[in-house]
Amino acid sequence: MVVEFKNEPGYDFSVQENVDMFKKALKDVEKELGQDIPLVINGEKIFKDDKIKSINPADTSQVIANASKATKQDVEDAFKAANEAYKSWKTWSANDRAELMLRVSAIIRRRKAEIAAIMVYEAGKPWDEAVGDAAEGIDFIEYYARSMMDLAQGKPVLDREGEHNKYFYKSIGTGVTIPPWNFPFAIMAGTTLAPVVAGNTVLLKPAEDTPYIAYKLMEILEEAGLPKGVVNFVPGDPKEIGDYLVDHKDTHFVTFTGSRATGTRIYERSAVVQEGQNFLKRVIAEMGGKDAIVVDENIDTDMAAEAIVTSAFGFSGQKCSACSRAIVHKDVYDEVLEKSIKLTKELTLGNTVDNTYMGPVINKKQFDKIKNYIEIGKEEGKLEQGGGTDDSKGYFVEPTIISGLKSKDRIMQEEIFGPVVGFVKVNDFDEAIEVANDTDYGLTGAVITNNREHWIKAVNEFDVGNLYLNRGCTSAVVGYHPFGGFKMSGTDAKTGSPDYLLHFLEQKVVSEMF
């Protein structure tokens, strides 16, 4: 009997025992850094001379791992392995596949501190964020396993005299998973193993910045007894193998989390039917956001400031759900801005091994991009707090607040993906919702209000996939807050939802006459 789903807890770091335990995990992980990691194709570990170097973004002199780089021929071999494995994997019962996934999650649970510690080094994640990432990975696997058990029952349809009908689900084939670096375990594990528990096989191309943590999942899958070829590990340069993976005639689906430019490219290329392809590809894409917190009049300004600061600067603003726009009613604008500045000054920035609140941004490209946007912000508005940058050892950007902006300013329109939040003043709630919707994106949003009519208006008109009342706009929880957005934020394939696995299944009807 499978127990009821419960979210995996984190660690309470106010308890010294947990602090000591995690410090030990960090030391143990550090001893293992710098090793070469292979491709994994049909269960075979293949080491290549050409490597992708993963480095610690907080200390660029520290090499995390050297990941073997897949070629197009390696990808072709991986497709052959996945197609062959699919022949038997699809015949496993849904319960057997789900039970194997529960074994995977149990192993991850035992290794949770190790997995989180790796993300502190490889992604620059603060302790709480890293542990939360590992826990969310467990949640996704556990949730999808139970979802598959439910879907295995099919859905009732009508019978009639002399005719019995069945409506059920079946897997669709081999697909490709392209996860992001910002949730390098949770999203990577969830988007890889959701199609797997549904009976499909996968080629996993990890993010170039975080291949080591993805390889750890491959180790765990092997330990759990996943058959060879069901998941194949092909790290590589997206310029070399990205289009090849997407275009391949055997790619039935692509799950992608990342930039708008890449997501729209994948969506476009997937629409082309290749020679030898006799199906239409499915794309499950999450492409970021320009998320806003709307602050109404007559509210708790302390709560509003805390919601803005935690949502804007948690994990250095490197969440697709991060608050990058604060849209504040004129009557409380100055007070909310002042309190937000005060809270921001209290945040610690540094190497997250030392348990700072904020760490580095992920790489030099992102560092330069964010630095440029801060300069743009200085021209468009007023720099109120932060703005400093330092890449002498790692890629550090101070939490930055820019005020006096207008809705059409670049700081308010373009995704920055860093610790920068812009403030705009509005005259009333109607204008606030207009400004909130004045973007190509529609992922998350929050409204701070005590006015029920205003909240109902936001529910009906604030055009985002995930909307929150009187809290920040980040920290969706699997099972509670299915996650996905509208417009250019993606295909709104809600992760952690009862419907998510349907993207990897076909519906079949069988009618039997008597």
Curated annotation (Swiss-Prot):
A GO cellular component annotation in the UniProt record: cytoplasmic side of plasma membrane
Molecular function per GO: 1-pyrroline-5-carboxylate dehydrogenase activity
GO biological process: glutamate biosynthetic process; proline catabolic process to glutamate
Pathway: Amino-acid degradation; L-proline degradation into L-glutamate; L-glutamate from L-proline: step 2/2
Active site, renumbered: 286, 320
Keywords: NAD, Oxidoreductase
EC nos: 1.2.1.88
Reactions catalysed, as given in the entry: L-glutamate 5-semialdehyde + NAD(+) + H2O = L-glutamate + NADH + 2 H(+)
UniProt family annotation: Belongs to the aldehyde dehydrogenase family. RocA subfamily.
Name of the featured protein: 1-pyrroline-5-carboxylate dehydrogenase
Organism: Staphylococcus aureus (strain NCTC 8325 / PS 47)
